[in-house]
C-alpha cells in the first residue's frame, strides 16, 4: 500500500482555505531565507505560493549568506512586532556561522508556526495543547489518521534524533491520546543491534538523511514504513539529480505492509501543517 501525502494534505488545506474565507482579515506568514541554497529556495517559494493560494498574506525575506547574527535577529524582532504577521519561520539549514538555536529562540513562541522554539518544544514534551507542534511530526500523525492506521499501543521505531523530527515525533507519539499512545524506540545511525530492533517495529519512521539507508533486511512483513528523508543523488536526467529517501524504496516495497513515497509522501503533509499552524496563530491573535 502506497501512503501518498497529497490526498490527506489537500483535505487539510481545503479546510484552512474555507476557514480563511469565513473570517475577516487574512493570516500573515513571513518566511526568512538566508543564503542561496537552491533546495531552500525551492522550499521557500513553495511555502509562499501555497500560503497565497489559500488567501494568506505571505512574504519572503532574503538575506545574503554572509549576513550577521545581529542582522537576522533584528529582522526577526521586526516580524515579531508586526501585527499583520501571525507566523514566522526561518528556512533551515542556516549558513554554518549562524547559530540555529539562537535564531529559532528569537522568534516569538506565539508566532513560531514551525514549532521549534524551546517553549513550544517544552509544551509538547509536557503534553500541553496550547503550543505549536513541529510540522513534520504532526503531519505524520495526520497521515496515520487519514489512512486509518492505529498508533495506540503499537511499537514505533524512529531512526533519527533531530530537534526537527526525531525528538518531537517521539514525544508526540507517546502522548496519552486515542490517536497516539504508542511505544516508541529512538535509534540513530550508530545504534547497536539496529537491524534486530527495526525488525520488531510495527511502524518504522526514518529521518536520518542518509540515502537508501533502510534496506529490506531491516523490515518485517507487518511493518509500515514512513520515509522522512529527502536527498539528492546524481542521476542521468536533465536536472542531473534525483530525489531519494532514507529507504531503499524499490526493494522494501515488496516486503512491507505500507510505505510513503519520496517525493510525495511526508513532504505535502509538512506544508499542510505549516498552513494549519499559521491559521491557528491568526485565530489566537485576533479572537
Swiss-Prot record:
Gene Ontology CC: cytosol
Reactions performed catalytically: (6R)-5,10-methylene-5,6,7,8-tetrahydrofolate + NADP(+) = (6R)-5,10-methenyltetrahydrofolate + NADPH; (6R)-5,10-methenyltetrahydrofolate + H2O = (6R)-10-formyltetrahydrofolate + H(+)
Keyword Oxidoreductase: yes
Segments forming a coiled coil: none
Binding site for NADP(+): 160-162, 189, 230
Subunit structure as annotated in this protein's UniProt entry: Homodimer.
GO BP terms: L-histidine biosynthetic process; methionine biosynthetic process; purine nucleotide biosynthetic process; tetrahydrofolate interconversion
Keywords (A to Z) from UniProt: Amino-acid biosynthesis, Histidine biosynthesis, Hydrolase, Methionine biosynthesis, Multifunctional enzyme, NADP, One-carbon metabolism, Oxidoreductase, Purine biosynthesis
MF (Gene Ontology): methenyltetrahydrofolate cyclohydrolase activity; methylenetetrahydrofolate dehydrogenase (NADP+) activity
Protein name, as recorded: Bifunctional protein FolD
Organism of this sequence: Chlamydia muridarum (strain MoPn / Nigg)
